[in-house]
């Protein structure tokens, strides 16, 4: 009997069977980073979890169109550039490169499409024009705002009462708004800020419209799955629905909405505003990235995850045992075969804790097995179970010889990329400082026609 993927759809608050609109080309959109600073480990939970989902969809359907955006125009980016006295592109190029390196270190496969907001200004402007033409948006004092009252279903994702939402918005209401709950699609830019010519004057897009336009451009008006952190459910995802469905004649924007829970640190939500973050960049310099990935998958994605050094240590110890089992099976030839119980666990709303329990069970059986056929079967299943979760893909010798500093290569590569971005922006002081930092660590840089290479002295 074919396996059936079931996912918790936050739109309906139910676990439902998933079937794509087009089985030959399922679509997945995940909200990506705003590249103004290092990503913290809480920011990595979604990419890791939805990396497991993307791999599952590819196995099941043979294809996938997966987009995860880069927000490279935002007031936080502007503030960071002004504070550091550097061009905005220096900030966005640097942190986009670091983000990609950090995700690669965690074993996250790049999405098929990684659209950047600044490369989609014409599409954003066109969508805003469509919303104005259909009376769902209006221009006022160089701004364009979405008229929330024009969309009867506003609030259907977050289940918030529209009157309560509007009441909460009545603090310091901008005079150009017709209604306190109306949100910005386009805003004017002063000469010192990034901006583009538009029918409403020089300006830049609001955050919400960027994702709507990029999703429609690359995946069409209706996508199968939209995913992101639960903190984005309102207002970001609610506003995406309103914009997209009004711009496309009422067509459903996303059929399934998946939201991952937050990471807690010492009992409080991990966030930059609270100052209790641990960056991926720092963590992969101190711990094997695979242990961080394991830790992120250790709780069900919809539940909060309590992050601690103890959790990381537990993940390291577990991986020591699993790689030790594979090392003991070094004399057995086997190719990865994903076991049915692991697929069944992932089919059950991405139940990664159950899948990891199956990994432990298989490893336990493998350690006891004496029969050659059983050992080969169990090694194949252990490799396959790891493959489904993005784990156990190193050689055991590599894990044990470099486990303590497995993230170092990714950290060095990120610094090399950061130096290249600094040179491009003519920030030579920063570029020289990075070169010196690497030299102090015994890393030699070689500028070649193909780019910068590095090696240990």
UniProtKB/Swiss-Prot annotation:
The protein's superkingdom reads Bacteria
Extent of motif 'KMSKS' region: 269-273
List residues binding ATP: 272
Q: What is one Pfam family matched by this protein?
A: tRNA-synt_1e
Q: What is its EC number?
A: 6.1.1.16
Query: Looking at the UniProt record for this protein, which Gene Ontology cellular component terms does it annotate, in alphabetical order?
Result: cytoplasm; cytosol
What biological process terms from GO does the record include? cysteinyl-tRNA aminoacylation
GO molecular-function term, one example from the UniProt record: ATP binding
UniProt short sequence motif 'HIGH' region, positions renumbered to this chain: 33-43
The protein's required cofactor(s) are namely:
Zn(2+)
Residues holding Zn(2+): 31, 211, 236, 240
- Where the protein is mainly located, per its record? cytoplasm
What note does UniProt attach to the cofactor annotation?
Answer: Binds 1 zinc ion per subunit.
Subcellular location per UniProt equals:
Cytoplasm
Q: Which UniProt keywords apply?
A: Aminoacyl-tRNA synthetase, ATP-binding, Cytoplasm, Ligase, Metal-binding, Nucleotide-binding, Protein biosynthesis, Zinc
Q: Which InterPro entries match?
A: Cys-tRNA-ligase, Cys-tRNA-synt_Ia_DALR, Cys-tRNA/MSH_ligase, Rossmann-like_a/b/a_fold, tRNA-synt_1_cat_dom, tRNAsynth_Ia_anticodon-bd
Which EC class is this protein assigned?
Answer: ligase
Catalytic activity, per the record?
Answer: tRNA(Cys) + L-cysteine + ATP = L-cysteinyl-tRNA(Cys) + AMP + diphosphate
Q: Which family does it belong to?
A: Belongs to the class-I aminoacyl-tRNA synthetase family.
Xref: PANTHER family: CYSTEINE--TRNA LIGASE, CYTOPLASMIC, CYSTEINYL-TRNA SYNTHETASE
Subunit-level organization: Monomer.
What is this protein called in UniProt?
Cysteine--tRNA ligase
Q: From what organism does this protein derive? A: Xanthomonas campestris pv. campestris (strain ATCC 33913 / DSM 3586 / NCPPB 528 / LMG 568 / P 25)
């Amino acid at each position: 009997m074919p396996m059936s993927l079931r996912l918790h759809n936050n739109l309906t608050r139910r676990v439902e069977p998933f079937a794509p609109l087009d089985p030959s080309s399922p679509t997945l959109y995940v909200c990506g980073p705003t590249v103004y600073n290092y990503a913290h480990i809480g920011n990595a939970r979604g990419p890791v979890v939805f990396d497991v989902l993307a791999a599952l969809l590819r196995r099941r359907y043979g294809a996938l169109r997966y987009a995860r955006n880069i927000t490279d125009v935002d007031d936080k980016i502007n503030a960071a550039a002004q504070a550091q006295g550097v061009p905005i592109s220096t900030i966005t190029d640097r942190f986009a490169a670091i983000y990609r390196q950090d995700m690669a270190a965690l074993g996250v496969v790049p999405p098929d499409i990684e659209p950047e907001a600044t490369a989609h200004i014409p599409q954003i402007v066109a969508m805003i024009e469509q919303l104005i033409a259909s009376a769902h948006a209006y221009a006022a004092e160089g701004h364009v705002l979405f008229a929330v009252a024009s969309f009867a279903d506003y609030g259907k994702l977050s289940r918030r009462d529209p009157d309560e939402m509007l009441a909460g918005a009545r603090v310091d209401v901008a005079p150009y708004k017709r209604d306190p709950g109306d949100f910005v699609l386009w805003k004017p830019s002063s000469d010192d800020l990034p901006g583009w010519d538009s029918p409403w004057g020089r300006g830049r897009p609001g955050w919400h419209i960027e994702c709507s336009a990029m999703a429609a451009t690359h995946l069409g008006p209706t996508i199968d799955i939209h995913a992101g952190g639960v903190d984005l459910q309102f207002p970001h995802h609610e506003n995406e629905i309103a914009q997209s469905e009004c711009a496309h004649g009422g067509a459903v924007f996303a059929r399934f909405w998946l939201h991952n829970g937050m990471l807690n640190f010492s009992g409080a939500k991990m966030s930059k505003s609270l100052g209790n973050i641990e960056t991926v960049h720092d963590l992969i310099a101190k711990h094997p990235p695979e242990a961080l990935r394991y830790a992120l998958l250790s709780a069900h994605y919809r539940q909060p995850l309590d992050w601690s050094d103890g959790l990381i240590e537990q993940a390291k110890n577990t991986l020591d045992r699993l790689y030790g089992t594979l090392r003991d099976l070094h004399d057995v030839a086997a190719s990865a075969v994903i076991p049915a119980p692991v697929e069944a666990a992932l089919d059950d709303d991405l139940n990664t804790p159950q899948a990891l329990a199956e990994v432990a069970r298989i490893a336990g059986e493998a350690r006891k097995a004496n029969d050659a056929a059983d050992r080969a079967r169990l090694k194949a299943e252990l490799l396959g179970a790891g493959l489904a979760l993005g784990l156990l893909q190193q050689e055991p010798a590599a894990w044990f010889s470099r486990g303590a500093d497995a993230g170092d290569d990714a950290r060095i590569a990120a610094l090399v990329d950061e130096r290249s971005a600094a040179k491009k922006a003519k920030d030579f002081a920063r570029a020289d400082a990075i070169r010196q930092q690497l030299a102090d660590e015994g890393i030699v840089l070689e500028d070649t026609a193909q780019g910068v290479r590095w090696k240990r002295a």
